């Protein structure tokens, strides 16, 4: 079984019960899914770039991503409707906990000048979104084989009703916060 999943079941649930005094087991917040989005603006000029982004995201997530398409045409960006402009992957269950573990233990310590996440990144409904500027912080990506450095947006969707519950939940997984 995964270490972060065991950590949640054995320690985090108990500390959440003590902190927020939940009466029902189903009130206890949990992580529902993690969505990783990689926008590829260069795909407008060169359609082969999207394949490299798909390969990177597949290596990082361990799951095949879907290609995201433009919803409407924007002439200033030379963008047409239904053009490929990025890729995303939604992780649930065991893959979600595996990715979170690799993110916290391996990837975040490799980010330069990283002090932690701001509490302002919560959306008011218990979800947490942050961005990484480089995909090379993940050990699965070989630095010599990438064509360009790309960033990604990572959203952690929780069942928490408030940001305070979500902060407490994610802090239990050793996600570093400052403030």
Swiss-Prot record:
GO terms for biological process: translation. Belongs to the universal ribosomal protein uL5 family. This is Large ribosomal subunit protein uL5. It holds the Pfam family Ribosomal_L5_C. Keywords: Ribonucleoprotein, Ribosomal protein, RNA-binding, rRNA-binding, tRNA-binding. This is one of the proteins that bind and probably mediate the attachment of the 5S RNA into the large ribosomal subunit, where it forms part of the central protuberance. In the 70S ribosome it contacts protein S13 of the 30S subunit (bridge B1b), connecting the 2 subunits; this bridge is implicated in subunit movement. Contacts the P site tRNA; the 5S rRNA and some of its associated proteins might help stabilize positioning of ribosome-bound tRNAs. The keyword Kinase does not apply. GO terms for cellular component: ribonucleoprotein complex; ribosome. PANTHER family: 60S RIBOSOMAL PROTEIN L11-RELATED (PTHR11994). GO terms for molecular function: rRNA binding; structural constituent of ribosome; tRNA binding. Gene3D superfamilies: 3.30.1440.10. Part of the 50S ribosomal subunit; part of the 5S rRNA/L5/L18/L25 subcomplex. Contacts the 5S rRNA and the P site tRNA. Forms a bridge to the 30S subunit in the 70S ribosome. The keyword Membrane does not apply.
């Amino acid at each position: 079984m995964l270490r972060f999943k065991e950590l949640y079941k054995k320690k985090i649930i108990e500390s959440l019960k003590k902190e927020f005094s939940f009466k029902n087991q189903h009130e206890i917040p949990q992580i529902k899914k993690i969505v990783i989005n990689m926008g590829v603006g260069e795909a407008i000029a060169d359609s082969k770039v999207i394949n490299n982004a798909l390969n990177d995201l597949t290596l990082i997530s361990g799951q095949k991503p879907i290609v995201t398409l433009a919803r409407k045409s924007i002439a200033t960006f030379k963008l047409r409707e239904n053009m490929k402009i990025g890729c995303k992957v939604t992780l649930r269950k065991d893959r979600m906990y595996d990715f979170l573990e690799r993110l916290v233990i391996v990837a975040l310590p490799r980010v330069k000048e990283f002090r932690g996440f701001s509490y302002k990144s919560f959306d008011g409904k218990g979800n947490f979104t942050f961005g990484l500027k480089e995909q090379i912080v993940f050990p699965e990506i070989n630095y010599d084989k990438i064509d360009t450095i790309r960033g990604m947006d990572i959203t952690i969707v929780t069942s928490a009703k408030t940001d305070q519950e979500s902060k407490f939940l994610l802090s239990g997984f050793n996600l570093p916060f400052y403030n």
